[in-house]
């Protein structure tokens, strides 16, 4: 179960302590447990939302979103911000885009992107709470993290060295595809036709975002993987809120 604990530590802010430095093979296998980490986060969000029952709706939605951000430690939002800055500031140039991604400072495009994504997430969560449809709080973390597995399965990693390279190089391809298939089936079983609609929308978003990465970078980075997760979580919530 060490790969699961690696995934849980890497993807969130829960107080997980590993017994030592993981081997590259264990890092690669940890990707297989990303959807399961999404299940853990989703169940925590569902439980927290249930505790807030009776709270004013806007406050309820704001607290759920705050808990969501705290669970992930803002890791993927940071990737989204870096990607937004790099995409507009890179002017279509691969090396300039990669260089801007490494800059820890956030420009105005990053701030605007984060505000818009969080605002849309808040509005979608509010709509789901109003309609007593909480399944999105489970599906969004699961699909977002499954998308990261899918990205590493079929997309070159363009930064040599580091954690991302170890993940990409040592990911078991066959089991990874089975995990993705099982995740998709579970989403449909849980949400029925709504789950089918969510998967279709997310598939379109996934392949479009992957195509953007391939055209600009020839692959993905940790930042673009985090951006993908955030945008697919948003796609899940918006799809369910609009159905």
UniProtKB/Swiss-Prot annotation:
The entry's keywords: Cell inner membrane, Cell membrane, Cobalamin biosynthesis, Magnesium, Membrane, Transferase, Transmembrane, Transmembrane helix
Main location: membrane
GO molecular function: adenosylcobinamide-GDP ribazoletransferase activity; cobalamin 5'-phosphate synthase activity
InterPro entries: CobS
Protein family per UniProt: Belongs to the CobS family.
Bilayer topology term: Multi-pass membrane protein
GO BP, one annotated term: cobalamin biosynthetic process
E.C. designation(s): 2.7.8.26
Entry's Gene Ontology cellular component terms: plasma membrane
Pathway: Cofactor biosynthesis; adenosylcobalamin biosynthesis; adenosylcobalamin from cob(II)yrinate a,c-diamide: step 7/7
Top-level lineage group: Bacteria
Cofactor(s) needed for function: Mg(2+)
Taxonomic classification: Bacteria, Pseudomonadati, Pseudomonadota, Gammaproteobacteria, Pseudomonadales
Annotated protein name in UniProt: Adenosylcobinamide-GDP ribazoletransferase
Pfam family, one: CobS
Subcellular locations according to the entry: Cell inner membrane
Native species: Pseudomonas savastanoi pv. phaseolicola (strain 1448A / Race 6)
Function per UniProt: Joins adenosylcobinamide-GDP and alpha-ribazole to generate adenosylcobalamin (Ado-cobalamin). Also synthesizes adenosylcobalamin 5'-phosphate from adenosylcobinamide-GDP and alpha-ribazole 5'-phosphate.
Reactions performed catalytically: alpha-ribazole + adenosylcob(III)inamide-GDP = adenosylcob(III)alamin + GMP + H(+); alpha-ribazole 5'-phosphate + adenosylcob(III)inamide-GDP = adenosylcob(III)alamin 5'-phosphate + GMP + H(+)
Segments traversing the membrane: 31-51, 57-77, 109-129, 135-155, 188-208
Main EC class the enzyme belongs to: transferase
């Amino acid at each position: 179960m060490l790969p699961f604990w690696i995934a849980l530590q890497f993807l969130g802010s829960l107080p997980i302590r590993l017994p030592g430095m993981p081997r590259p093979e264990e890092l690669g296998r940890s990707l297989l447990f990303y959807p399961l980490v999404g299940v853990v986060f989703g169940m925590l969000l569902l439980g927290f939302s249930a505790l807030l029952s009776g709270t004013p709706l806007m406050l309820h939605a704001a607290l759920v979103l705050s808990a969501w951000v705290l669970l992930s430690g803002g890791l993927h939002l940071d990737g989204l911000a870096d990607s937004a800055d790099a995409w507009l500031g890179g002017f279509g140039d691969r090396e300039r885009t990669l260089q801007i991604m490494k800059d820890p400072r956030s420009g105005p495009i990053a701030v605007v992107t984060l505000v818009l994504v969080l605002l849309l997430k808040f509005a979608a969560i509010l709509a789901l709470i109003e309609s007593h449809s909480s399944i999105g709080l489970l599906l969004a973390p699961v699909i977002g993290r499954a998308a990261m597995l899918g990205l590493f399965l079929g997309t070159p990693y363009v930064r040599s060295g580091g954690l991302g390279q170890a993940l990409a190089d040592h990911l078991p391809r066959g089991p990874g595809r089975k995990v993705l298939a099982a995740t998709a089936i579970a989403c449909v079983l849980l949400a029925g036709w709504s789950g089918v609609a969510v998967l279709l929308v997310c598939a379109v978003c996934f392949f479009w975002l992957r195509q953007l990465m391939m055209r600009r970078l020839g692959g993905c980075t940790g930042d673009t993987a985090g951006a993908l997760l955030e945008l697919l979580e948003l796609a899940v919530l918006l799809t369910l809120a609009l159905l």
